[in-house]
């Protein structure tokens, strides 16, 4: 009988119809489990390309890795960028480590808009050393991880604070060399410093110099410039950013408000009907003494305002209209109410025409019709 799985959703990757499963959101701790399995699948022939692929799978392009611990000469804190992360993991194995994995206990997760933060106060980094003697090192501390909130769930920030470490030697090795004081003296010495090998510590010290030079190395690789030219270019661009004036806030362009044609036509009609009524009025306004090209009898219409290569805004246009024309307001359409009040269909005793005059000018306009009656 064939050993084909009975899962209806199973599709062999070697078959003609390979189906990739829909990506799903996994738990952050499971990503650490996948990273441990990937580190265990490492071989002695793993080159830089393998480590670059490892870092690309589990770390973001702008990821940072930070290690904090305390040595004999004081506390240390090293932060490296995404470019130097693959080399960090490779130096761990170059220092005699044969196996590396992380154990997270009682971790706390917090979800944000674009990231997931994992805070594990009881994290253990376990390394197996094959030389000079078989030793198991347990490095305990606090691990804070920030994952991206997407299907890839790659690490954006890695911060491991080392508190203590222990080096464990099997009893069988002690029993074998119980009669050899030189071997026992060698086994009593630590092979790591705060759980890190000398290879890793030297690399972290080197990263203090390499991390600021990432821009120079990237420019050298991109433009094929000499190191001196790369340094000059970077310094010049940094100087430009320092002396450049702050960017001015963008101003919104002024919009030009045009007159409504229907209001203008109704105003001209109403002014033509009221010519005889206002002929006997002795009122004289400043607007009547001005002359404009677009002028109708007894009504002053303001044209489009311009000013030496620029245009007035809405606020200026309203101000000019208010100064030059006291009988006509194009913005609010006050002439419609004047047409309604002066309609011949309304008598003097009509309840719709009982609005008292507001100013002395209105009384003077209504005086001639009352005299004619």
UniProtKB/Swiss-Prot annotation:
Biased composition (Polar residues): 341-373
Top-rank taxon, per record: Eukaryota
Places the protein is found: Nucleus
Major subcellular site: nucleus
Region named Disordered: 244-287, 327-373
The keyword Repressor appears for this protein: no
Pfam family, one: LIM_bind
GO cellular component, one term: nucleolus
Gene Ontology process terms (BP): epithelial structure maintenance; hair follicle development; positive regulation of cellular component biogenesis; positive regulation of transcription by RNA polymerase II; regulation of cell migration; regulation of kinase activity; somatic stem cell population maintenance
Keyword Ubl conjugation: yes
Recorded GO MF terms: enzyme binding; LIM domain binding
Comp. bias regions, Low complexity: 263-280
UniProtKB keywords: Nucleus, Ubl conjugation
Residue ranges annotated for the LIM interaction domain (LID) domain, each copy included: 298-337
Tissue expression notes: Expressed in multiple tissues including heart, brain, liver, kidney, testis, lung and muscle, with expression highest in the brain, trigeminal ganglia, and lung.
Post-translational modification (record): Ubiquitinated by RLIM/RNF12, leading to its degradation by the proteasome.
Gene3D superfamilies reported for this sequence: Cysteine Rich Protein
Family affiliation: Belongs to the LDB family.
Subunit organization: Interacts with LHX9. Interacts with SLK; leading to negatively regulate SLK kinase activity. Interacts with LMO4.
Name this polypeptide is given: LIM domain-binding protein 2
Taxon lineage: Eukaryota, Metazoa, Chordata, Craniata, Vertebrata
